Amino acid sequence: MASVLANLASWRLVLLFVAACHHAAPPQHAANVYRGYASWYGEAQMTASGERFNPHALTAAHRTLPLGTRVRVTNTRNGRSVIVRINDRGPYGKGRIIDLSEAAAKQLDMIDAGVAPVTLEVVR
């Protein structure tokens, strides 16, 4: 009986430790950080937000983020970043998570490559 109680006490300690680890909170922004590939587009058209596309504005297209969301895009090849406003829907190319305006792509130094690995962080 004493060994059963000792075993039970040991398991309680293990469960307490596991529970304490489980409740450790991840960084608050972890759910708002995405990794993938960015591309850019420059043709004139209407955007999903109803505004005319402006290749000189710091804007972008994303499939699911609410229109108006501001996102920090970082080119992981060179560390350059830019904050863009989501005003359109897309991209529709395989493996891409954001389509940038020409101005945003220039700031990330990805015009010639056309596609770059990026991280996205929602800033508001």
Summary of predicted features, one role per range:
Residues 2, 17, 21-124:
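Secreted/periplasmic proteins
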